[in-house]
C-alpha cells in the first residue's frame, strides 16, 4: 500500500508536528525497543533512521506508522512532511531524547517506524526464472549483509534467504547498508535445511563461493535455475551443507590477498550472472 501525499485539505506541515518530551511515550518506547532488538515490532513495523533511508522507504511505497524528528533538525521536517500521508504520526523530540532512541552515534535527525512487506519462501522460488536466489548462512557482519541485499537488487536476484545464525535484516547497520533494497527485495528467514530440501525438489543448482578451490568463475556454467550460497566470515559453510553444493565457484584474485569478504564475493558472482544473462 503506497503512502498518500498531502492533499489541499491536509494541515500545514508545521501544524502536524507535536512535541514529545517523555521517555515513556508509547511510540518512543516502541521505536527504542525495535532499534535495540533489531527486530520488527509486534505490529510488524521496522525502525529506520536517517534522511536517505526514510526517503527510500517513501520511494518504495512503504506504510509509515510514525516519524520522529530531532528538535535541532526541524529543517528536515519541512522537507519530508509533505511527502508523508496525513495519517502518519509525526513528532519532534528534544535532542537528548532523540539520541536515546536511535542507535547511531551521529544521528541524522529523523527516525521512523515503517511497515515491512513480508515474502514467503514460495514467493522467492516462484521467481527463480527471473534471477538467482541468494542463500546466506551464518553471516554475522551487518555491513556485509547490507551489501549483499543491495547487490542482490542491483543485479536482479530473485530474492535472499537468510538461514539461522545470520544477523537480523532489521539491524540498523543492515538497513542502512542496503540503501533501501531491503524495502523492495524479497527477503525471508528460514532454516537452511528447509531451503536446501526445496531447492533439491525444484532441481535448482546450488553453488557456493571460495577464494581458492573450485571452478574459476569465468569458466563456470551459470545457466538455469541457480542458488548462490554465501557463508559467514569465520566458520564459513559447514561440511554437511557443502556436501550438498553442486559446484564451488572460485573467484580469481591476487594470491597475496587471502580472501574476499562475503559482501564483495556475493556481489562479484551476482554481477557475473547478470552480465551473462544480458549478453544472451
Identify the meaning behind each predicted range.
Residues 207-257, 261:
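Active-site/ligand-binding-proximal alpha/beta "capping" segment
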Residues 105, 110-114:
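C-terminal edge-of-domain segments
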Residues 4-5, 52, 59, 94, ...:
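RNA substrate-binding interface of SAM-dependent RNA methyltransferases
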Residues 84-103:
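A glycine-rich helix N-cap at a beta->alpha junction
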Residues 1-79, 166-167:
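Boundary-proximal intrinsically disordered activation/regulatory segments immediately upstream
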Residues 75-87, 241:
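Short, aromatic/basic amphipathic alpha-helical patches
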Residues 112, 151-155, 164-181, 239-280:
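Structured adenosyl-cofactor binding patch, chiefly the S-adenosyl-L-methionine
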Amino acid at each position: 500500500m503506497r503512502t498518500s501525499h498531502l492533499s489541499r485539505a491536509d494541515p500545514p506541515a508545521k501544524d502536524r508536528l507535536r512535541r514529545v518530551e517523555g521517555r515513556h511515550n508509547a511510540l518512543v518506547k516502541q521505536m527504542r525497543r525495535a532499534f535495540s532488538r533489531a527486530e520488527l515490532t509486534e505490529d510488524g513495523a521496522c525502525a529506520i533512521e536517517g534522511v536517505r533511508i526514510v526517503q527510500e522507504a517513501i520511494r518504495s511505497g512503504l506504510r509509515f506508522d510514525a516519524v520522529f524528528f530531532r528538535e535541532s533538525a526541524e529543517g528536515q521536517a519541512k522537507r519530508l512532511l509533505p511527502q508523508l500521508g496525513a495519517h502518519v504520526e509525526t513528532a519532534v523530540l528534544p535532542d537528548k531524547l532523540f539520541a536515546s532512541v536511535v542507535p547511531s552515534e551521529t544521528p541524522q535527525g529523523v527516525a521512523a517506524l515503517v511497515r515491512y512487506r513480508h515474502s514467503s519462501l514460495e514467493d522467492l522460488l516462484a521467481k527463480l526464472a527471473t534471477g538467482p536466489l541468494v542463500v546466506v548462512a551464518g553471516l554475522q557482519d551487518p555491513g556485509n549483509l547490507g551489501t549483499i541485499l543491495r547487490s542482490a537488487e542491483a543485479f536482479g536476484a530473485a530474492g535472499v534467504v537468510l538461514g539461522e545464525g545470520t544477523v537480523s535484516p532489521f539491524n540498523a547497520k543492515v538497513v542502512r547498508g542496503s540503501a533501501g533494497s531491503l524495502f523492495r527485495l524479497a527477503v525471508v528467514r528460514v532454516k537452511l535445511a528447509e531451503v536446501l530440501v526445496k531447492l533439491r525438489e525444484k532441481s535448482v543448482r546450488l553453488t557456493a563461493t571460495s577464494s581458492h578451490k573450485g571452478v574459476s568463475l569465468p569458466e563456470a556454467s551459470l545457466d538455469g535455475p541457480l542458488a548462490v550460497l554465501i557463508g559467514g566470515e569465520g566458520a564459513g559453510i559447514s561440511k554437511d551443507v557443502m556436501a550438498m553444493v553442486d559446484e564451488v565457484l572460485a573467484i580469481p584474485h591476487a594470491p597475496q590477498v587471502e580472501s574476499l569478504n562475503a559482501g564483495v564475493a556475493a556481489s562479484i558472482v551476482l554481477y557475473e550472472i547478470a552480465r551473462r544473462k544480458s549478453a544472451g
